[in-house]
Amino acid sequence: MYVFNSTQKIWTNGFDSTFKKYFGYDILPYMIQGIDSFPEVRYDYMTHLGKYVTEGFYKPYVEKCNDLGAWSRVQCLASPTDVMTTYSLVDIPETESMLNNPNYSRIVSSSACLSSKRLVSSETFTCMYGFPHTYLHEEQTADLKIVADAMFAHGVNHHVYHGMPYNPIGSDTNTFF
């Protein structure tokens, strides 16, 4: 599993009925009017969505991996869940490293520590200076070392070198962004 990249207003069949059962009111009128105008309702929505994603995706995913004799390694960073809880469910919590924000790894390694996980992995050296096309192909070796050292200091102990090594033969262009 790579990353659960999500957007706002995620919905699925039955979400409204289970929401009403759990919270005691109908969410549909608020969704129609714009849930962001109702902070308390938005909080309930996000709480319910987090439970849906955790119970309906992450837990079954981890169980399936384990049933097949595999480990689950997941980046939960964009997940609409309580990421500390979600990271504690997977076998190998994974972060990613960027020179412009190495501190996020602390959340991942903290969750791993609290749930007795031995490995914390990182998709390392991707988007070193921020997202797409910011100094692309201008990474400096010294910066790679700074990032790796910061990741180790923040509790990451398994680096997956991601990016240039995976480009097709004869190409030095990474176009998946």
What is each stretch, according to the model?
Residues 1-83, 164:
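Polysaccharide-binding and catalytic clefts of secreted carbohydrate-active enzymes
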